[in-house]
């Protein structure tokens, strides 16, 4: 196997354990080469296929992991950690999809952040140069050795080999923060959990499951809020789709976060993406489906659909307030939605029933995550078809 090398400048951002030398090879096989016991990066071309890159942004504890499980299920096969690798790896791999956690691009470990007085949300605690270089390489069909941030120890572990998949999902705090990384994305999603719901969820989890006090939970939320407002929240303006989770309007004064109002905000004019609509495209519609065909206990279910603007962009909004009593009855709602990009009648309902134990399966979070997953599958298929058609057209010309 022919291997060529060139020297990387000493200021290069190659991450932990990634030093002076960078290698390229013309086969998918790789081997680790070291000089004077110094580890290095091996990057291998992986054929002519180009990887599709999806970005998912959200704060910690806002449902990214559940969304990833729904998305990989749509493509078939469960996402699992790399076999034989670091047991604390954050990467998930399925037949078609690789999910990279952007925490792996922390440039400071837990102790380093504490010493410098910065949070993981602060750009100064993250290596955006390396993030850009490696996402770009994977998109171009090259394998990379990606660093690992160990959430158990808070340390930066030795890197792991990531081969270019058909679909690369980069999820975390900053997938749309750096304009260079943002420009590499073929589609982007932001999970926008309101402060009220986020607080209610954290209380339910940390008080009920972890024994934390209410005061400590409030202090934790307030400590990270300035950085969240400055660096994470603004990314939603760039997203192609936003799933916004709000307190219900069906129960006056509800603060428990158990019944939710969820909005799917879909940007118009995105290539290979046509927004989902209810009944009549472009109209403004309020629909209460409870009755003979849908079982609804208090407080019921209410849908809304209509056009809107979002950060100056034309968008289509689909909203669900309330929750399902019986998931099998979701087929009635599905039959009134269009542009779902399903392969067969009832696929949304089937996916929801398949993962009814996932958080949010009885409300709009699970429904809209599933719908976005189906839309991403359709976008992927259209992108692949367009790339296949382009060389054929050039040959005929």
Curated annotation (Swiss-Prot):
Pfam families: PRK (PF00485). It catalyses: D-ribulose 5-phosphate + ATP = D-ribulose 1,5-bisphosphate + ADP + H(+). GO terms for cellular component: chloroplast. Light regulated via thioredoxin by reversible oxidation/reduction of sulfhydryl/disulfide groups. Its EC number is 2.7.1.19. The keyword Transmembrane does not apply. Pathway: Carbohydrate biosynthesis; Calvin cycle. GO terms for molecular function: ATP binding; phosphoribulokinase activity. InterPro entries: P-loop_NTPase, PRK, PRK/URK. Residues 1-44 form a transit peptide. Gene3D superfamilies: P-loop containing nucleotide triphosphate hydrolases. Belongs to the phosphoribulokinase family. This is Phosphoribulokinase, chloroplastic. It comes from Mesembryanthemum crystallinum (Common ice plant).
């Amino acid at each position: 196997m022919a291997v060529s090398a060139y020297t990387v400048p000493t200021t290069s951002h190659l991450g932990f354990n990634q030093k002076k030398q960078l290698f390229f090879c013309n086969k998918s096989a790789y081997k680790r080469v070291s000089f004077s016991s110094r580890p290095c990066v091996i990057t291998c071309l992986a054929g002519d296929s180009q990887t599709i890159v999806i970005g998912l942004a959200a704060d910690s504890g806002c449902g990214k992991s559940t969304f990833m499980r729904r998305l990989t299920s749509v493509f078939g096969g469960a996402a699992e950690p790399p076999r034989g690798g670091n047991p604390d790896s954050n990467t998930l791999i399925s037949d078609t999809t690789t999910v990279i956690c952007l925490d792996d691009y922390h440039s400071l470990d837990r102790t380093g952040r504490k010493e410098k007085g910065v949070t993981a949300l602060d750009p100064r605690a993250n290596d955006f140069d390396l993030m850009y270089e490696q996402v770009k390489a994977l998109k171009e069909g090259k394998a990379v050795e990606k660093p690992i941030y160990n959430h158990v120890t808070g340390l930066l572990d030795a890197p792991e080999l990531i081969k270019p998949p058909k679909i690369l999902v980069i999820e975390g705090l900053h997938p749309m923060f750096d304009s260079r990384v943002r420009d590499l994305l073929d589609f982007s999603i932001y999970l926008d959990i309101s402060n009220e719901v986020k607080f209610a969820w954290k209380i339910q989890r940390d008080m009920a499951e972890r024994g934390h006090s209410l005061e400590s939970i409030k202090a934790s939320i307030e400590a990270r809020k300035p950085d969240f407002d400055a660096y994470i929240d603004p990314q939603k303006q760039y997203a192609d789709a936003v799933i916004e989770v709000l307190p219900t309007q069906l129960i006056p004064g509800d603060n428990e976060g158990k019944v939710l109002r969820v909005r799917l905000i879909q940007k118009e004019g995105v290539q290979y993406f046509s927004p989902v609509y209810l009944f009549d495209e472009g109209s403004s519609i309020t629909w209460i489906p409870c009755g003979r065909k849908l079982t609804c206990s208090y407080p019921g279910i209410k849908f809304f659909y209509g056009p809107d603007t979002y950060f100056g962009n034309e968008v289509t909004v689909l909203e669900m307030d309330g929750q399902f009593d019986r998931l099998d009855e979701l087929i009635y709602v599905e039959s009134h939605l269009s542009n779902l990009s399903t392969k067969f009648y009832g696929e949304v309902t089937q996916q929801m029933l398949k993962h009814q134990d996932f958080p949010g399966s009885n409300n709009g979070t699970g429904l809209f995550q599933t719908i976005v997953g189906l839309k991403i599958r359709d976008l992927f298929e259209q992108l692949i078809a367009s790339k296949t058609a382009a060389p054929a057209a050039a040959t005929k010309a």
